[in-house]
């Protein structure tokens, strides 16, 4: 869902003021690939942290559910990171309502997996406590927070 929403992103007003990219440089440049790897590492680390926390608190079912939920939410939040080079504070969270709707629909679907008994059975989802759900949300938000802080610092808007 976030990928479709990003496709609906309004064009950057400063796009024509930027110098053209080097035609000899591939689409996947070294700096861009580095950003992708770093962002993937952050999401992966948050997911592994959630799994470890869940395993220590309730075994494999809780660990898997926390990891699944953290990864799902982190990817939904990451859609906002992929909107452009500017931070969310510069772009405005609501400037692309498709991204907000994608987040909402994704959260509703994830909650269905976590709280609808039939879907819990299909996905082998464990019952999470309130503190575990809070940990999932905070863990999923952490990569986006780091990426947004980096964007603000690199743009000089922090």
Q: What do these predicted regions represent?
A:
Residues 1-158:
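C-terminal transmembrane helices and immediately adjacent loops/tails
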């Amino acid at each position: 869902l976030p990928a479709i929403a990003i496709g609906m992103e309004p064009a950057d007003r400063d796009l024509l003021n930027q110098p053209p990219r080097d035609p000899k440089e591939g689409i996947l440049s070294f700096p861009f690939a580095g950003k992708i790897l770093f962002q993937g590492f952050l999401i992966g680390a948050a997911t592994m942290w959630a799994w470890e926390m869940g395993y220590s608190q309730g075994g494999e079912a809780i660990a898997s559910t926390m990891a699944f939920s953290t990864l799902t939410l982190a990817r939904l939040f990451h859609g906002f990171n992929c909107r452009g080079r500017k931070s969310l504070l510069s772009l405005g969270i609501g400037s692309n309502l498709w991204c907000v709707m994608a987040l909402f629909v994704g959260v509703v679907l994830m909650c269905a997996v976590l709280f609808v008994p039939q879907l819990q059975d299909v996905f082998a989802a464990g019952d999470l406590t309130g503190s575990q759900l809070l940990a999932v949300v905070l863990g999923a938000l952490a990569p986006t927070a780091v990426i947004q802080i980096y964007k603000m610092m690199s743009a000089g808007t922090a």
